[in-house]
């Protein structure tokens, strides 16, 4: 496959979102400890990673400890405002470097996308970045993809979108005529498309396989 532009999702596509969750939970626990004088770090880790309470985590914690639900918003803010460095997947930087000859875009529905890019140290790799929550929209809106393609001056037929979540990542770019590639990795590994037009054109299990699909060649060896 030869393309003139490659666009990426961010969470679980270029890095492991669980690392973002871990650092965010630490920051939220630090803030709660500053308010209460008690440590809830272990409880938050248990709820999120062991009991898999990934929605309403802070509500559940506050309920368990009979603390005011009014603290939820502040804890969510601390979670997303964490500043600890994040690490891309080991092969991410090498893959992006190998794609330097074509424009690169990034489209993410994840809150705090700009903060994540800075913490990952890969912002400068991208020629166009759209973080949909800042625009009060999502990747379900074709305008999001059209905006990036216009900024990169390429047509949909010349572009590819790489993502991981078949619920949201592929339907719109498929409809626009973009090629789509799923990285089956991360939180949504076991989720299958619920409709035909949400299925990707290609599927890979390791990001450096993208170079093979795009006929770019193998990346330079990376340190693990």
Regions found by a protein language model. Name each.
Residues 1-6, 98, 103-224:
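Asp-based, Mg2+/Mn2+-dependent phosphohydrolase catalytic module
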Residues 2-94, 115:
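N-terminal helical cap/lid subdomain that shapes the substrate entry/recognition surface
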């Amino acid at each position: 496959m030869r393309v003139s532009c490659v666009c990426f999702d961010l969470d679980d596509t270029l890095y492991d979102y669980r690392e973002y969750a871990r650092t965010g939970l630490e920051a939220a626990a630090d803030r709660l400890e500053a308010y209460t004088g008690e440590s809830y770090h272990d409880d938050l880790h248990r709820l999120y990673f062991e009991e898999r309470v990934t929605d309403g985590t802070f509500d559940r914690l506050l309920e368990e400890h009979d603390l005011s639900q009014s603290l939820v918003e502040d804890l969510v803010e601390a979670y997303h405002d964490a500043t600890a460095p994040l690490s891309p997947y080991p092969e991410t930087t090498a893959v992006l470097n190998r794609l330097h000859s074509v424009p690169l875009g990034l489209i993410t529905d994840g809150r705090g996308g700009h903060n994540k890019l800075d913490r990952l140290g890969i912002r400068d790799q991208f020629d166009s970045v759209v973080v949909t929550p800042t625009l009060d929209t999502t990747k379900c809106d074709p305008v999001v993809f059209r905006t990036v393609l216009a900024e990169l001056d390429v047509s949909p037929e010349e572009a590819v979108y790489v993502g991981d979540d078949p619920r949201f990542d592929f339907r719109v770019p498929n409809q626009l005529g973009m090629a789509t590639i799923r990285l089956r990795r991360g939180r949504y590994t076991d989720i299958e498309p619920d409709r035909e037009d949400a299925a990707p054109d290609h599927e890979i299990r390791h990001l450096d396989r993208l170079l093979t699909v795009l006929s770019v060649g193998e990346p330079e060896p990376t340190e693990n």
